[in-house]
Amino acid sequence: MNQLIVRQLGVQPYEEIWHQMQDFTDNRNENTADEIWLVQHPSVFTQGSAGKPEHLLNPTNIPVVQTDRGGQITYHGEGQQVMYVLIDIKRLKAQGKDVSVRDLVTALEQCVVKTLADYGIEGYPKPDAPGVYINGKKICSLGLRIRQGRSFHGLAFNVNMDLTPFRNINPCGYAGLEMTQLKDYIAESEAQCDLVSPKLVAHFYNILGYNAQQIINK
């Protein structure tokens, strides 16, 4: 059985969840089910492993955390749906699925593209700049870390949030990159993380071919 466990964690501090992801990845074994963690974070900038300090344009009272995911600096805040994917890529390959790290990135991008399509919105990835875009504006950022063939970190999908803090950085290292969110395209009553997250999970589940799912609230 290829099971996917989905944990709904609510609003949690970034560093606490980050360290829990590291512990989970370090202590899992070949029988540990893959997991998705759905969470929102209080305001925080996170700097990826390739991050350059000059991409923080204006220091603020928002904390900056140096993390171990790929990529440059980004912002997390409430109203942004974060989906962390703790996936055993080695096991998927052993099951006959040709899944590389690039394939996992593509799967994450496609689950966002398909979720946007559910709302009648055309989103698309860029081959040279991971993430998902609408008319040149970025709505979803991606960053992964692979340790011993197992992934952690994931995607951050802007749903209904204050985008102002993004003005203090070059998002994902790109000067002048404009951010957007789902609320700009649909009714605010529909642009809610608890309505969007099941769509993200369902598309990810189908793209990677899981055949069982368990949902855990906190």
From Swiss-Prot:
Pathway: Protein modification; protein lipoylation via endogenous pathway; protein N(6)-(lipoyl)lysine from octanoyl-[acyl-carrier-protein]: step 1/2. The keyword Manganese does not apply. Transmembrane segments: none annotated. It catalyses: octanoyl-[ACP] + L-lysyl-[protein] = N(6)-octanoyl-L-lysyl-[protein] + holo-[ACP] + H(+). Its EC number is 2.3.1.181. Residues 30-212 form the BPL/LPL catalytic domain. The keyword Transferase applies. It is an enzyme of class 2 (transferase). The active site is at residue 172. Belongs to the LipB family. In the reaction, the free carboxyl group of octanoic acid is attached via an amide linkage to the epsilon-amino group of a specific lysine residue of lipoyl domains of lipoate-dependent enzymes. This is Octanoyltransferase. The lineage of its organism: Bacteria, Pseudomonadati, Pseudomonadota, Gammaproteobacteria, Pasteurellales.
